[in-house]
């Protein structure tokens, strides 16, 4: 399913449906296809919002959970969302947790799916290997409950990002 990405100032996001606001924060490998089933289900009863976290736009110093939480906080203030059902997946769950601990006045409920920060599967006994496609594929697969979620297109995208950001 393809969704229109809206822009309001510096913020890019998807917004579908009407009703109570459900904001979904994506993970590190945040392909919108990961949320398409949830968007399709809830857009009939909720305003579903998926802000595009600036994972590769922020400078390295601010590409942190704290930096992403600040970005998210400014986003919901800018859009004036209140009584939000906040759902975070993976890194997005970690950002949601930090946000709830700092600024809970706009959040009605919190839903976590595979949130980082609860249990971390480290990189293992090796250093990250740029240029090694097979290594990147395996690490990308480890990110998901179902390794088949790491499609060739997603692995290609991660491989490109890892090798460009030096």
Task: For the regions a language model picked out, list residue spans one by one.
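Active-site glycine-rich loops that stabilize anionic/oxyanionic intermediates
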Residues: 19, 27-30, 90
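Conserved alpha/beta-hydrolase catalytic His-Asp/Glu region
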Residues: 130-166
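Serine-hydrolase catalytic-loop signature spanning alpha/beta hydrolases and amidase-signature enzymes
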Residues: 27-37, 48
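Active-site loop/oxyanion-hole signature of alpha/beta-hydrolase fold enzymes
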Residues: 8-10, 14, 40, 49-91
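Alpha/beta-hydrolase fold catalytic core
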Residues: 1-22, 44-46, 60, 145
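Active-site loop signature of alpha/beta-hydrolase-fold enzymes
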Residues: 30-31, 54-57, 118
